[in-house]
Amino acid sequence: MIDSIKFSDEFNKAFKKLKKRYKSLPNDFLSLLHELKENPIQGVALKNGMRKVRISFASKNRGKSGGVRVIIRLTVSETCLSFLYIYDKQDMSNVAETFLDQLIVEMDNNSNKIN
């Protein structure tokens, strides 16, 4: 059961940019958030407890394959869900592992927490 959620600064910046381009993103993201709270083990497993989850959204009129990717991380205890980064597959096919590792370090040092 997820009891806390964190957002990296990079996630917040990228989300804000994507929100300008895709008006349905906030609602589509809320749907994903509810799904992840129920079952956080979704998407493709990456290293260090990270996962890449696909979102389809109404603004693009496409399925998940052409949509947005969200990189999340579960803590060892699996009670905290961290949103590391969000990107449009159209703009970027993958995110560098070194960039994701840097985001993990920054998130571990900062506490940008909501409950």
Locations of the language-model features?
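Arg/Lys-rich, positively charged N-terminal/basic patches that mediate binding to nucleic acids
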Residues: 1-31
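Enriched for short, Lys/Arg-rich terminal
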Residues: 2, 68, 73-115
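Non-catalytic, surface-exposed connector residues within folded enzymatic/regulatory domains
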Residues: 5, 23-26, 44-47, 65, ...
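Short, structured surface patches at the beginning of a domain
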Residues: 24, 28, 44-46, 58-60, ...
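Negatively charged, low-complexity tracts enriched in Asp/Glu with abundant Ser/Thr
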Residues: 28, 32-37, 42
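Basic/aromatic recognition patch in beta-strand/loop cores that engages polyanionic ligands
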Residues: 41-86
